[in-house]
Amino acid sequence: IESALDESDLVIDASPSGIGIKNKKLFYEPRDIMSIYQGGEAIEGDNAVSDMLFNSRVNYNDAVGKKHVMQGSCNVTGMGRILEPLRKNFGSSIKRFDVTLVRRWADIEQTDENVTDTIELTQSPHHGEDVKSYFGKDSPLFVRAIKVPTRQMHLHIMDIRFKENTPSVDEIHNTFKDEYGVATLWSAKGTKDIRDFAGKLNFSF
């Protein structure tokens, strides 16, 4: 890997959780190479790969000039894409966000990991703190996660509470009308319908 790094300006580190920090210290920092890490790494403590968790919808400009940046997990990225437009449009009128993550047990390509026939609840998963790293620690965001025995996909259930006047359904939908990476489906009954629709658009899972 050293010879390839000597010819590189930027590394996208997709190694397993905890390996990114080792690669940073062993390979990237000595060569002064810019690096992007995936969500399994940390942004706080001795094992932090960066002091910034990146979300293109929230803090794109803040990443300019950074040597090391961590890209959030798919769940953390998805929450940012949905919640940030609501924050921008309705701001101080929002009382709190309550998010329930229904997480798949294992990714489709993780064939070596068995899907256990059980359901697990995590009251305070890391996803909430990860999102607060770019929303602000005082953001009224409350997250819990339920892990279910499927490989299909993740599902987010979001309850947005407003202080007084609640926006109409049309106002909420219009918030996402021009959002990149967000689609409104009226006929999907379940995650399979969403996957089938995404497949027709040539999205990769």
Where are these regions (language model features)?
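C-terminal substrate-binding/catalytic lobe of Rossmann-fold NAD(P)-dependent oxidoreductases
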Residues: 1, 93-96, 100-101, 107-205
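N-terminal Rossmann-like NAD(P) cofactor-binding subdomain of oxidoreductases
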Residues: 1-108
